[in-house]
């Protein structure tokens, strides 16, 4: 059974365990694994305003995804940056795609108009995923990070998810969104995965 739900504080160590494997690759530009305390602080900071989701398979967390503000200044409030990390054993099974669909549907309720994703150029799997989801390349940051003895380019993907009204409604915090609407979106997307036997999907 697959379950997609909002994050809880008690998930922090399981999520950090997944993230730590990526810290040792160019996929994450963080060079040292953060402490449990620091990681929990990040979860709390992000999840108070934006969707932060986890995916469980038979009760075990196998991935997580969240949205966060794209930039700090007020005029950027209608954009959000998306991040997804999946346990390597579950890559390529549709979980990342399902996370994105759930996040985007929630972000629409929050009046987000554009979503972004920053992807290390060498991460070809993520490149293919974003293109298949209708993201386009907004630009490339050349040699923007140095890690593991190499300079790395970063691709900025973008996707429009709302109308650019002349006078847009302000961004709504996740706290302003009805909990049942979020639960329903998570359930709709987890049902898609439950109709596929991901344990036997290549």
Walk through the language-model features, giving the residues of each.
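Helix-loop element at the rim of GNAT/NAT acetyltransferase active sites that forms part
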Residues: 17-33
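Conserved GNAT acetyl-CoA-binding A-motif
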Residues: 107-119
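Glycine-rich phosphate/pyrophosphate-binding loop shared by adenosine-nucleotide-utilizing enzymes
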Residues: 2, 60-64, 152
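A short beta-loop-alpha structural element at the N-terminal edge
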Residues: 3-15
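Conserved beta-strand-loop-alpha-helix junction that forms the acyl-donor binding cleft
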Residues: 91, 117-127
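Conserved catalytic-core motifs of GNAT/GCN5-like acyltransferases
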Residues: 116-119, 136-153, 162-163, 168
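Conserved acetyl-CoA-binding loop-helix of GNAT-fold acetyltransferases
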Residues: 92-105, 128-132
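Acetyl-CoA-dependent GNAT
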Residues: 31-89, 100, 160-162, 200-201
């Amino acid at each position: 059974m697959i379950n997609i739900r909002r994050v809880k504080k008690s998930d922090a160590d399981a999520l950090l365990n997944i993230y730590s494997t990526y810290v040792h690759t160019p996929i994450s530009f963080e060079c040292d694994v953060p402490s449990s305390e620091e990681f929990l602080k990040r979860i709390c900071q992000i999840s108070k305003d934006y969707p932060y989701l986890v995916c469980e398979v038979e009760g075990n967390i196998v991935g997580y995804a969240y949205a966060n503000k794209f930039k700090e200044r007020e005029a950027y409030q209608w954009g959000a940056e998306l991040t997804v990390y999946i346990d390597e054993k579950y890559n390529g099974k549709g979980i990342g795609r399902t996370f994105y669909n759930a996040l985007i549907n929630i972000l629409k309720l929050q009046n987000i108009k554009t979503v972004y994703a920053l992807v290390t150029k060498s991460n070809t799997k993520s490149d293919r995923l974003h293109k298949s989801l209708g993201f386009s390349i907004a630009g490339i940051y050349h040699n923007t990070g140095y890690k593991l003895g190499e300079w790395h380019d970063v691709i900025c993907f973008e996707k429009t998810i709302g109308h650019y009204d002349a006078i847009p409604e302000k961004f709504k915090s996740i706290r302003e969104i009805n909990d049942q609407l979020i639960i329903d979106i998570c359930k709709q997307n987890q049902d898609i995965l439950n109709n596929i036997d991901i344990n036997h999907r290549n």
